[in-house]
C-alpha cells in the first residue's frame, strides 16, 4: 500500500441531515443551560414544510421547542418558501416523552463516580500528525470547503448560493504521506438565475482555491463542480433529513473505525457521545506527545456499569513504545468512567449546537481537543 488514494466527504449546515442534527443539539443546549443534569435523547426529522422533534427527556427545565426549531432553521438560512423550507412557516411538531426509569436506575448512583454508562456500546477515537489539528487531511479539508461555502453565502460574496451543499476530496498518499489531491467534488444548491459556467468559475475562485493548499493541486487534479448541471431543489425539499445519519462526516471521514453511535441530541451521560469525545482526547494527546504518528483508541461499556469493559490502543506501526504500555498510560492519566470523563472534559455546558455541523473533531474550541496531557504522557513514557 505504498501508493494509494483516500477519499472523505462532508456536508454543509443546510444539508437536511445536518439541519436535523443542529435542531437536536439546539434543543439539548437549551435544556442543559437550565438543567445541566438533564437526560436528553432528542431526534429530529425534517421534510418539505415540516419538522418533527421527538425523543426522551427527563428534566426540570422548560424550553420552547417550536421557537428553538425556527431559530435554528433561520440561522442556517432557510427563510423563504422558494427553497421549499421556510423557518417562518414550516410546521413544528413535538413528540417528546420521558426517559425510561429502567435506564435511569442503571445510570444514577449515590457516588457520582460510580455513575453507570447510559447504554452498552463501543466507541473509537483517532488522531494523526498529518495536519496541524491532528486530524486526517481528507475530512479536514472536506469540512473547510463546505464551511467556506456557507461563509460566502452568508456574507453576500455569492448571493445565489443556497444552504445545501456537499464536498468530497480524494487525496494521494505515498508511503503514508500526502503527495497531492487527485479529485475535488463540490455540489452546491443555487438559485435558478445562475448559469452552470458562472457557478463553476465562482466556486473555483471563491471556495476551492482559498481553501485547498496550492502545493497539493496540480494540472492532473480533477474538479467536479455541480456535475449534474443543476441543483436548485435541495435541503429538506429535496431529501428528508434525520438526526444521526452523518456519523462518518461527524468523525474521521472513514479514516478510523466507528462504533455506530451517533452524537447529536444526546446529553453527556450517553457514552455514544461523551466516550467518543474522550477517546479523541486520548488519541490526540498520545500523538501530540510524540508517542505515535497515528493512534486509534477503542473503549467499550456495559449499561449501568461505570468502568469501561475494554480499552484498546492501535498505532499502526508508528508507536514509539509498546501498545500494552500505552494502554497502561491511558488507564493512569485519563478518567474514562462516564461521570469522570464528563468532569475531565467539562461537558455539562451548552456547547453542542456548534458541533453539529463541520465535524466534532479538529476544532480547537472544544475541550476534547486540548493536548494538556501530552507532556505528562511523554515524561511517563521516558521519551526526551
From Swiss-Prot:
<dbReference type="GO" id="GO:0005524">
    <property type="term" value="F:ATP binding"/>
</dbReference>
<comment type="function">
    <text>Catalyzes the formation of S-adenosylmethionine (AdoMet) from methionine and ATP. The overall synthetic reaction is composed of two sequential steps, AdoMet formation and the subsequent tripolyphosphate hydrolysis which occurs prior to release of AdoMet from the enzyme.</text>
</comment>
<feature type="binding site" description="in other chain">
    <location>
        <position position="99"/>
    </location>
    <ligand>
        <name>L-methionine</name>
    </ligand>
</feature>
<dbReference type="Pfam" id="PF02772">
    <property type="entry name" value="S-AdoMet_synt_M"/>
</dbReference>
<feature type="region of interest" description="Flexible loop">
    <location>
        <begin position="99"/>
        <end position="109"/>
    </location>
</feature>
<feature type="binding site">
    <location>
        <position position="262"/>
    </location>
    <ligand>
        <name>ATP</name>
    </ligand>
</feature>
<dbReference type="Pfam" id="PF00438">
    <property type="entry name" value="S-AdoMet_synt_N"/>
</dbReference>
<keyword id="KW-0547">Nucleotide-binding</keyword>
<dbReference type="InterPro" id="IPR022630">
    <property type="entry name" value="S-AdoMet_synt_C"/>
</dbReference>
<dbReference type="InterPro" id="IPR022631">
    <property type="entry name" value="ADOMET_SYNTHASE_CS"/>
</dbReference>
<keyword id="KW-0479">Metal-binding</keyword>
<keyword id="KW-0630">Potassium</keyword>
<dbReference type="GO" id="GO:0004478">
    <property type="term" value="F:methionine adenosyltransferase activity"/>
</dbReference>
<comment type="similarity">
    <text>Belongs to the AdoMet synthase family.</text>
</comment>
<dbReference type="GO" id="GO:0006730">
    <property type="term" value="P:one-carbon metabolic process"/>
</dbReference>
<feature type="binding site">
    <location>
        <position position="239"/>
    </location>
    <ligand>
        <name>L-methionine</name>
    </ligand>
</feature>
<feature type="binding site" description="in other chain">
    <location>
        <begin position="230"/>
        <end position="231"/>
    </location>
    <ligand>
        <name>ATP</name>
    </ligand>
</feature>
<dbReference type="InterPro" id="IPR022636">
    <property type="entry name" value="S-AdoMet_synthetase_sfam"/>
</dbReference>
<dbReference type="Pfam" id="PF02773">
    <property type="entry name" value="S-AdoMet_synt_C"/>
</dbReference>
<keyword id="KW-0460">Magnesium</keyword>
<comment type="pathway">
    <text>Amino-acid biosynthesis; S-adenosyl-L-methionine biosynthesis; S-adenosyl-L-methionine from L-methionine: step 1/1.</text>
</comment>
<dbReference type="InterPro" id="IPR002133">
    <property type="entry name" value="S-AdoMet_synthetase"/>
</dbReference>
<feature type="binding site">
    <location>
        <position position="43"/>
    </location>
    <ligand>
        <name>K(+)</name>
    </ligand>
</feature>
<feature type="binding site" description="in other chain">
    <location>
        <position position="56"/>
    </location>
    <ligand>
        <name>L-methionine</name>
    </ligand>
</feature>
<dbReference type="InterPro" id="IPR022629">
    <property type="entry name" value="S-AdoMet_synt_central"/>
</dbReference>
<keyword id="KW-0554">One-carbon metabolism</keyword>
<dbReference type="InterPro" id="IPR022628">
    <property type="entry name" value="S-AdoMet_synt_N"/>
</dbReference>
<feature type="binding site">
    <location>
        <position position="266"/>
    </location>
    <ligand>
        <name>ATP</name>
    </ligand>
</feature>
<keyword id="KW-0808">Transferase</keyword>
<feature type="binding site">
    <location>
        <position position="239"/>
    </location>
    <ligand>
        <name>ATP</name>
    </ligand>
</feature>
<keyword id="KW-0963">Cytoplasm</keyword>
<dbReference type="GO" id="GO:0000287">
    <property type="term" value="F:magnesium ion binding"/>
</dbReference>
<feature type="binding site" description="in other chain">
    <location>
        <begin position="245"/>
        <end position="246"/>
    </location>
    <ligand>
        <name>ATP</name>
    </ligand>
</feature>
<dbReference type="GO" id="GO:0005737">
    <property type="term" value="C:cytoplasm"/>
</dbReference>
<keyword id="KW-0067">ATP-binding</keyword>
<feature type="binding site" description="in other chain">
    <location>
        <begin position="164"/>
        <end position="166"/>
    </location>
    <ligand>
        <name>ATP</name>
    </ligand>
</feature>
<comment type="subunit">
    <text>Homotetramer; dimer of dimers.</text>
</comment>
<dbReference type="GO" id="GO:0006556">
    <property type="term" value="P:S-adenosylmethionine biosynthetic process"/>
</dbReference>
<feature type="binding site" description="in other chain">
    <location>
        <position position="15"/>
    </location>
    <ligand>
        <name>ATP</name>
    </ligand>
</feature>
<protein>
    <recommendedName>
        <fullName>S-adenosylmethionine synthase</fullName>
        <ecNumber>2.5.1.6</ecNumber>
    </recommendedName>
</protein>
<feature type="binding site">
    <location>
        <position position="17"/>
    </location>
    <ligand>
        <name>Mg(2+)</name>
    </ligand>
</feature>
<feature type="binding site" description="in other chain">
    <location>
        <position position="270"/>
    </location>
    <ligand>
        <name>L-methionine</name>
    </ligand>
</feature>
Amino acid at each position: 500500500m505504498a501508493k494509494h488514494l483516500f477519499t472523505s466527504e462532508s456536508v454543509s449546515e443546510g444539508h437536511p441531515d445536518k439541519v436535523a442534527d443542529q435542531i437536536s443539539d439546539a434543543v439539548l443546549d437549551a435544556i442543559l443551560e437550565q438543567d445541566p443534569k438533564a437526560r436528553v435523547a432528542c431526534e429530529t426529522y425534517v421534510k418539505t414544510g415540516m419538522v418533527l422533534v421527538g425523543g426522551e427527556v427527563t428534566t426540570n427545565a422548560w424550553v420552547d421547542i417550536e421557537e428553538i426549531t425556527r431559530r435554528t432553521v433561520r440561522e442556517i438560512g432557510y427563510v423563504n418558501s422558494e427553497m421549499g423550507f421556510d423557518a417562518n412557516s414550516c410546521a413544528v411538531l413535538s413528540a417528546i416523552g420521558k426517559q425510561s426509569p429502567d435506564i435511569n436506575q442503571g445510570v444514577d448512583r449515590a457516588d457520582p463516580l460510580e455513575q453507570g454508562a447510559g447504554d452498552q456500546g463501543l466507541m473509537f477515537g483517532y488522531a494523526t500528525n498529518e495536519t496541524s489539528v491532528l486530524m486526517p487531511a481528507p475530512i479536514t479539508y472536506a469540512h473547510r470547503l463546505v464551511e467556506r461555502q456557507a461563509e460566502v453565502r452568508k456574507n453576500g460574496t455569492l448571493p445565489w448560493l443556497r444552504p445545501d451543499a456537499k464536498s468530497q476530496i480524494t487525496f494521494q498518499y505515498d508511503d503514508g504521506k500526502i503527495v497531492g489531491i487527485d479529485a475535488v467534488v463540490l455540489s452546491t444548491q443555487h438559485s435558478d438565475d445562475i448559469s452552470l459556467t458562472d457557478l463553476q468559475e465562482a466556486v473555483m475562485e471563491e471556495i476551492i482555491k482559498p481553501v485547498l493548499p496550492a502545493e497539493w493541486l496540480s494540472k492532473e487534479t480533477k474538479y467536479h463542480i455541480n456535475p449534474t448541471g443543476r441543483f436548485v431543489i435541495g435541503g429538506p425539499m429535496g431529501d428528508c433529513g434525520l438526526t444521526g445519519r452523518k456519523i462518518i462526516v461527524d468523525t474521521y471521514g472513514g479514516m478510523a473505525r466507528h462504533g455506530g453511535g451517533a452524537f447529536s441530541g444526546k446529553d453527556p451521560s450517553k457514552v455514544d457521545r461523551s466516550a467518543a469525545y474522550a477517546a479523541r482526547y486520548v488519541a490526540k494527546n498520545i500523538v501530540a506527545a510524540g508517542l505515535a504518528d497515528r493512534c486509534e483508541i477503542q473503549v467499550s461499556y456495559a449499561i449501568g456499569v461505570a468502568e469501561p469493559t475494554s480499552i484498546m490502543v492501535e498505532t499502526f506501526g508508528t508507536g514509539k513504545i509498546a501498545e500494552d504500555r500505552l494502554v497502561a498510560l491511558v488507564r493512569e492519566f485519563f478518567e474514562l468512567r462516564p461521570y469522570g470523563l464528563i468532569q475531565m472534559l467539562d461537558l455539562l455546558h451548552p456547547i453542542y449546537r456548534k458541533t453539529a455541523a463541520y465535524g466534532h473533531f479538529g476544532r480547537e474550541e472544544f475541550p476534547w481537543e486540548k493536548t494538556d496531557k501530552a507532556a505528562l504522557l511523554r515524561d511517563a513514557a521516558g521519551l526526551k
